[in-house]
A protein has these predicted regions:
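Residue-level signal for the start and early helices of compact helical domains
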Residues: 2, 8, 62, 82, ...
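Noncatalytic linker/hinge segments flanking ATPase motor cores
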Residues: 7-21, 46-52, 86-94, 107-114, ...
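Active-site loop ensemble at the mouth of alpha/beta enzyme cores that anchors a bound cofactor
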Residues: 26-28, 55-124
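C-terminal accessory subdomain/extension
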Residues: 99-187
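Conserved active-site and cofactor/substrate-binding residues in soluble primary-metabolism enzymes
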Residues: 28, 32-36, 87-90, 132, ...
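Active-site loop/helix belt of alpha/beta enzymes
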Residues: 1-83
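Generic secondary-structure boundary/loop-capping signal
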Residues: 8, 14, 63, 70, ...
């Protein structure tokens, strides 16, 4: 230890295990990862053993602090896991074009969505393509859509999606309840 350094604990993150679907395999791998972190804790001391995440929160019984953050907003990737959490973050876009060939275009794309975990999802049909500023959607019923309609897009990864925006709009149904600024942008 360096002179004058006040160690409060250790922090690890078994991020490579978040999306393991086999619960028994995940439990075994979390235990192995935490054994390494607990050994580091023995060496440096402190009160805090920080680790875990949204994908391992219920299996990680070794940490004194769980780092789960995505659970508050969820995304389409974490939604694939069996968790008690529901998606809460979406990007609201406006339909700007309706093609008679069966698709619609809305005004959100790569610059509005975190795409590192794949395509976003849409409850009313399929996401066909995302360009920088637009998303091409294949609705189940094309006749239901017109220019100016709103579409709710569910991001595949909430963290980089949040970093692309200035504020959250808290909505309940069609009512805006509050607006929260986003401090950390462009990370």
């Amino acid at each position: 230890r360096a002179a004058g350094l006040d160690v409060r604990g250790v922090m690890g993150y078994e991020g490579h295990l978040m999306m393991v679907h086999d619960r028994d395999a995940k439990r075994e791998k979390v235990e192995a990862a935490m054994a390494i972190l607990l050994r580091a804790h023995e060496l440096v001391g402190g009160d805090i053993v920080s680790g875990g995440g949204t994908g391992t929160w219920d299996l990680n019984t070794w940490c004194t602090e769980i780092q789960a953050g995505s659970y508050t907003l969820m995304d389409t990737q974490y939604d694939e896991l069996e968790t008690p959490f529901e998606k809460a973050l979406s990007v609201l876009a406006t339909v700007i074009s309706v093609s008679p060939k069966g698709w619609i275009i809305a005004d959100c794309g790569l610059k509005a969505l975190g795409m590192d975990h794949g395509n976003p999802s849409w409850d009313e049909g399929d996401v066909f393509f995302c360009s920088d500023e637009h998303i091409t959607l294949m609705p189940r019923e094309l006749s239901d859509w017109k220019v100016g309609d709103r579409v709710r897009i569910w991001p595949a990864h909430v963290d980089p999606t949040v970093a692309r925006h200035e504020q959250f709009w808290m909505v309940e149904g069609d009512t805006i309840r509050d607006r929260w600024p986003i401090d950390l942008r462009h990370w």
